[in-house]
């Protein structure tokens, strides 16, 4: 029997799920991890705690199934959340700044007033907002001495959660196009980091991971799941679009999770919305076959239920 494993690393919890060839779930395990709120604007995760939750979920599943049946694994992850870690030690230099975090509004205001990069920003498909990775990277550079000194020594990697997990699994610096397209540094047309934006903000290209297609061999795991290849990586909402078989232009999916996200497959076309939708990569398989999407998002959906549970104590479980 051949199985496929999936790491689903979300905003509030992590799952490891094993599927058979028919797509049926064979086994799974889920674990929540800590949320940190330094102030009313900030939301952080401990990257090591994220990794520990992944390891715990995998180990729990491997107690019930034979690892030799798992032929490959994929990664689906919370998007935009940004991690900075040392190339030499592999240790995080600061907590991960989560997509919900709004501390970088003043940085975004400065970017908005910069007329030199308006066309380059347009090529990212995204509005200038605290939601995306660019302002988080700039905040880390400007406010964390360990990041500043590591940047000067060419010893820092800025990555989204997929990059962090790939690094922990096999020691490489890689990301996929869907996650890269959520950074405000990715060119939708060239499918590369936008050099003008990198130069404008003094972000060295070698401080960012290498961009690969969503369906790609990212190498074999060297730690837990040793020898098993990583063959797919997508941001969680794009993974949902793919998982719901929205392969045709015009097909739509909507997900209610921590937030609410509706994505429409636009096929080969890069469509810029006039009504506040985001333009993003849907998925890519092979070097050339890339599909795009437009996205509408609401930051707070299930997060409101968690707030009622954890902050107001009006309920004991989310199911209530």
Placement of each model-derived feature along the sequence:
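A conserved helix-loop-beta module that forms one wall/lid of the active-site cleft
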Residues: 198-216
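Glutamine-centric residue-chemistry signal
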Residues: 9, 30, 78, 100, ...
